[in-house]
Amino acid sequence: MNEEEQFVNIDLNDDNICSVCKLGTDKETLSFCHICFELNIEGVPKSDLLHTKSLRGHKDCFEKYHLIANQGCPRSKLSKSTYEEVKTILSKKINWIVQYAQNKDLDSDSECSKNPQHHLFNFRHKPEEKLLPQFDSQVPKYSAKWIDGSAGGISNCTQRILEQRENTDFGLSMLQDSGATLCRNSVLWPHSHNQAQKKEETISSPEANVQTQHPHYSREELNSMTLGEVEQLNAKLLQQIQEVFEELTHQVQEKDSLASQLHVRHVAIEQLLKNCSKLPCLQVGRTGMKSHLPINN
């Protein structure tokens, strides 16, 4: 019974373990940090010391500990923390998206003055220019209206096509109306605009204009034609109508695609400007994104 009631005494004081390298050794070889002791004598407060008097360890371990602690890292590496790099990349991305979405390229060069086009087609990204609104500026509201006066232009052009559909002079010239938004000479038709401009430069005399127009046939001329000539003329006219409507369909689809992209960009601008108030580290200004939170190195 006496042997079962005996307990083993365990010494919880690890006096034989170095507080730096955590290796067990003889108690005689362990001592307090002599470097911290000397610094304390020189007037350094105890709160600034690395080791207290209660810590025991090897003399070499304390010296190596202080040597490593005194090796300061370069300031440039400390300043470039992961948070700062991510914040910089995010700021540049937001800045680029807002600048691209606003389409505010106000640089008026000679090309823009000679060939005035819609601002959607002459936008050029310049990273040095930061076209950002003020932080307290009003969020721009998107309007579903495509262009001022566009509805009237589309209806006029459509009405003109329907009125002259039975005319033998039906062709691309019907759509070359400067007042109609969907006509070829409009800025919304950039691909065919250059071709029409080249044709206008080559055609300068009224005689040439008469030659380029489709021939008109009177009822007597049509009656005098043979059945084969009439069928050939009819097939040619139908082919011209098909080509015009295919081109018109392509341009309308392109316009719808641009309108959809413009809508997405306006929504993105609204969301970005609203979310800026939720990011305390970013402030939108004329000079771009600025950080107001100090980075703990």
Swiss-Prot record:
Pfam families named among the record's database cross-references: EURL
Organs and tissues of expression: Expressed in the brain. Expressed in cortical cells of the germinal ventricular zone and the cortical plate. Underexpressed in the dorsolateral prefrontal cortex, primary visual cortex and cerebellar cortex compared with Down Syndrome patients (at protein level).
Any coiled-coil regions, as ranges: 227-256
Superkingdom of this protein's organism: Eukaryota
InterPro entries the record matches: EURL_prot
Compositional bias ranges of the Polar residues kind: 203-215
Signal peptide: none
Record bears the keyword Coiled coil: yes
Keyword match Coiled coil: yes
Region (Disordered), start-end ranges: 194-216
Keyword terms, alphabetized: Coiled coil, Differentiation, Neurogenesis
Complexes and interactors: Interacts with CCDC85B.
Record family assignment: Belongs to the EURL family.
Free-text function comment from the UniProt entry: Plays a role in cortical progenitor cell proliferation and differentiation. Promotes dendritic spine development of post-migratory cortical projection neurons by modulating the beta-catenin signaling pathway.
Name of the protein in its database record: Protein EURL homolog
Originating species: Homo sapiens (Human)
Gene: EURL
